[in-house]
A protein has these predicted regions:
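Bacterial N-terminal signal peptides
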Residues: 11-24
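Formylglycine-dependent sulfatase
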Residues: 25-390, 401-427, 432-434, 472-473
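N-terminal secretory signal peptides that target proteins for export/translocation
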Residues: 1-10
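Extracytoplasmic
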Residues: 339, 415, 419-594
Length: 594
């Protein structure tokens, strides 16, 4: 079993092969700038790979990236999804950029921030993202507004349908085909095939092994009755079927990573493509993670430590390279722009550091630093040796990566130094507070604006379909006093086509609903009735209690409504209720007409 503090076994890899590879690939590197492919797993722990010693799972394709390139010994991300994605995209701590959470608008990356895609786009690259965005749904938070020429996937932080899912392509609704990770990979490969003659960035942020627990049958059959040898640190908290499903999803993810790597090789691109792989936070359930404490949502090692694998065969990253200084998601933007030899777009100072001297074995002095983590009011600082938590605990991660012993009392000077640094960092970060940013509507360059239930507020007896706002819908609309509101800011005065994604029991059809914004009010009749059953065949295991069970929503063509420029509440209410309920509401779409 591998201990998370050591990668000694990896050092035995045949480094001599690297000289031959570099010689063979030198010509290719000189011909054009490198392509960049970035894989991000969702809720995968450090221990979810055969490379890190997990004998429960087999991940040869992901492992091959590590074996052919560099491995970061201690790489840190955030406790939750959206903050990590924001830090990767910008090279800056998420708290600086408006990212305060994972839903209800808290996930949005401030519009004055520049992303990695902005930099590569400005340098002449074609840029594409395929998967879970999770940094804003409306323009100018949308990926097409953040430097990506092509986008296919979903912008929410959680998705409730993993088979034939409703997705979007560049802001327009589409229907995916098959299992979602396979479908996202299909589109990423098509993008690579279409643009292989010029430099490209392909960002593939998967949404697995994040729940719901749904995986193709052939993968589940591998794990359904498989003994789980390596267990969570606290086996009593581990739900073995959830571990099996998460690992089945990991093997599917590995299959899809392998598909991309194979296509790069077939197109003659693998040698001059920088390939990056990491995860956005720790595992979503207690399962084997090298003995580390904590899971997703924690600032402990298990919550924020991820693998980081980087490969560039033609660029000087030698197989067997191990990055021993602590690293973080904030380092990837400066590193990738440096490796590609392009300038960074944007003037705001970076928090991350360029790792290319470590990757390329340059004799550049490396100054030790601290890396900081935040989850709500809990914060933590990490040095090359220690973890200091805002509660006052200190752990020696070199001798005790499992955090089994608090050594604060034995190291008062270290505690003082790290507490002071953490306090200064916290004072520098904006405070966590209620997000007061409205949802922008009606940008002329992106006329369709989705307003999902996630971004609205229910009033009266209306409630969400489950506790987690992401991928929820409004239910229990029974009273004339009930309403739903969205805080919007209309950018362009004009006529808007209004669509409502709804379901309604057939006997309840006929209610009259009203939509109001400032001085504009329009009404419509809820018809026809449409009451599909909840999907029963998508899930491999029961959903966690906070996740909504999904169904097929239809579009109610509400009509056209004139919206004046300005900020206000978009309010949906009923003027007449024809039956027991009005309808369930998943989303309102507002499309600016010419």
């Amino acid at each position: 079993m591998k201990r998370p503090g050591s990668l000694n076994a990896f050092a035995h890899f045949c480094v001599a092969l690297s000289a031959l590879l570099l010689l063979a690939c030198a010509t290719a590197a000189a011909e054009r700038p490198p392509n960049v492919v970035i894989f991000v797993a969702d809720d995968s722990g450090w221990g979810d790979y055969s490379f890190t010693g997990n004998t429960n799972v087999h991940t040869p394709s992901i492992d091959s990236i590590a074996q052919s390139g560099a491995v970061a010994e201690r790489f840190y991300v955030c406790p939750l999804c959206a903050p990590t994605r924001a830090e990767f995209l910008t090279g800056r701590y998420h708290s600086r950029m408006g990212v305060r959470g994972v839903s209800t608008g808290l996930e949005r990356l401030n519009v004055d921030e520049k992303t990695l895609a902005d930099s590569f786009h400005a340098a002449g690259y074609v840029t594409g993202a395929f998967g879970k965005w999770h940094n804003g749904s409306q323009w100018p938070y949308h990926p097409n507004a953040r430097g990506f020429d092509e986008y296919y996937g979903f912008t929410s932080g959680h998705w409730g349908e993993y088979f034939d899912p409703p997705l979007e392509r560049n802001g327009k609704p589409v229907r995916g085909k098959g299992f979602i990770a396979d479908d996202l990979t299909d589109h990423a490969i098509s993008f690579i095939e279409m643009h292989h003659a010029r430099p490209f960035v392909c960002y593939l942020p998967f949404n697995t092994p994040h729940s719901p627990w749904a995986v193709p049958k052939e993968y589940w059959q591998r794990f359904r009755q498989k003994p789980i040898g390596l267990r969570a640190s606290d086996p009593a908290r581990e739900r073995l079927d959830e571990t099996r499903c998460a690992l089945a999803m990991m093997e599917n993810l590995d299959f899809n990573v392998g598909r991309v790597l194979k296509r790069l090789e077939e197109l003659g691109l693998s040698e001059n493509t920088i390939v990056v792989y990491f995860s956005d936070n720790g595992p979503n359930t207690p399962r084997w993670n090298g003995g580390m404490k904590g899971i997703k949502g924690s600032t402990d090692e298990g919550g924020v430590r991820s693998v980081l694998f980087l490969q560039w065969l033609a660029g000087g990253i030698r197989p067997g390279t191990v990055i021993r200084p602590i690293t973080a998601a904030i380092d990837l933007l400066p590193t990738l722009t440096a490796l590609a030899g392009i300038s960074r777009v944007g003037e705001k100072p970076l928090d991350g550091r360029d790792l290319s001297p470590l990757l390329l074995h340059k004799n550049t002095p490396w100054i030790d630093r601290m890396i900081f983590s935040r989850q709500d009011a809990r914060t933590a600082a990490r040095s090359q040796r220690y973890l200091y938590k805002s509660e006052g605990a200190l752990f020696d991660l070199v001798d005790d990566p499992e955090q089994s012993k608090n050594v604060a009392s034995a190291n008062p000077n270290v505690v003082s130094q790290m507490a002071r640094a953490l306090g200064e960092w916290r004072r520098e970060m904006p405070s966590i507070e209620r997000d007061l940013r409205p949802y922008p509507v009606g940008h002329s360059e992106f006329p369709r604006t989705p307003l999902p239930a996630r971004d609205g507020i229910p009033h009266g007896t209306v409630r969400r379909s489950a506790g987690a706002p992401n991928c929820s819908y409004f239910v229990n609309w029974r009273s004339l006093e009930d309403r739903m509101t969205w805080d919007i800011d209309v950018q362009t005065e004009g006529d808007y086509e209004v669509e409502i994604l709804y379901t309604c029991p057939v006997p309840d059809a006929g209610s009259i609903i009203e939509l109001n914004f400032l001085d504009s009010t329009e009404s419509a009749v809820v018809t026809p009735g449409w009451d599909p059953p909840l999907y029963a065949n998508q899930d491999t295991l029961p959903r966690p209690p906070g996740e909504s069970k999904m169904k097929e929503f239809r579009t109610l063509p509400f009509g056209t409504m004139h919206l004046e420029e300005g900020r206000g509440l978009l309010t949906l209410r009923a003027r007449k209720i024809a039956g027991r309920t009005v309808m369930d509401v998943r989303q309102i779409n507002l499309t600016l007409t010419e």
